[in-house]
Amino acid sequence: MLRGLPEATVIRDPSDWAPFLRDESHVRGVAPLAVVKPHGPSALRELVRRAKAEGFGLVPRGAGTGKAGGCVPTDRTVVVDFSAWPGEIVVSPQDLCLHAPASALLRDVKAAAETHRLFYPPDPNSWESCALGGTLATNAGGPNACKYGMTRHWVLSLDALLEDGEIHTFGISSVKANAGPALGQLFIGSEGIFGFILGATLRLTPLPREFVTLLLPVKHWEDLLDLPGRLCGAGFLPSAFEFFDPAVLAELRAHGPDEARRLPGEALAILEFDERGCTSESFLEGLLDLLGPVADGLEVAADVRQRQGIWAVRRMTSVFLQERHPGKVSEDIVVPRSRLREFFEGLDQLRIPAVTYGHLGDGNLHVNLLAAGATEPAHLDHQLVELFRLALSLGGTLSGEHGIGLAKRDAFLALSDPAHLHTLRALKQALDPQNIFNPGKVI
């Protein structure tokens, strides 16, 4: 299989394929035909040619940190592992941008920007280990999306492999580019079904010079639900607004690390602000006035060490719950800030055994069904569909940042607007008529 492929390492031994059959979701893939690590464009050109001639598909893979099964192999596919794709991170401070290959780790992208006192905001929970290409293909989010938006808001241009086997660049290194539709945006969040992302030019902004990190414990957890809308309505836009519901907080206190065992409240929020003046007394006084009695237990991180400790607990929550409940299923639905209370009231009425934490500030909630592994599959599917229907009924969506992949494909197809699906299929047919790019995913 794939003999004589130029500029590539081909892994043919099935005993070496295990790491490539999964990501961080519950989805498991089938054995691929091979795993290929391309080192240059001639490898991709030949891969595309052979895929079209021999009738197999190509599955892109970055660091394997996805949450929806988007990078796992399906029938008659070759995994294309971009971890060794060449390229350097090049920062242009004058243009407030940088260019990086898909193989670059997001932590290195962010660090390169920060050496010039610049900031690349997207910060998914896996930011220290995920690859840039994967964050582009899934339109990754994270806590900072509350203020700064998703990955797609920070992409100026994109390098993509198309079905002709060539690498094409869409966009320029400027915030202004209006010569027709922004075709590069089609690839962001497409999970590789239109073509493969090989690199991108990313927009940067000056690095925030001030931070204030706040712990907000509450005696009655419903008191948190109106706060995102109240804060935004009063002109307080946090750069992050995270939360733990009572069940998650209880698990952390009972079984988590020492930092988690000391967390106060029935439920808890983490708020962070990074605007100029946010550390001033007047800013904090205005915030306290707005919060009112809810802020009785408010704690301000005293220094960088305490701030890092707070965020360490938040960042480890997903792994902690996975270790405690190996069969759990984690969803990432979204509802508008103004309808958070309605969502949780509806969730109670559905009687779905779930715990929640995540990005309260932008309505992106990680709803975890801890007993999913012990639940009859048909009943679990019913619970998930009911959860998705609830989010959709409130003007939300079934995925805020993880994507569709294989994990949510059936629900996505069942619940989406037919016109939406028709348009996606038309785009797929136009850009990938032989269905070689990540077949079986999303649609």
Question: Which residues make up each language-model segment?
Answer:
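N-terminal flexible segment immediately upstream of the FAD-binding catalytic core
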Residues: 1-49, 65-96, 125, 248-258, ...
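C-terminal substrate-recognition/cap domain of FAD-linked oxidoreductases
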Residues: 12-17, 21-23, 206, 212-386, ...
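FAD-binding subdomain of flavoenzyme oxidoreductases
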Residues: 87-91, 98-242, 437
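Activity-critical C-terminal alpha-helical subdomain
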Residues: 166, 409-443
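Short acidic/histidine-rich active-site segments
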Residues: 397-404, 439-440
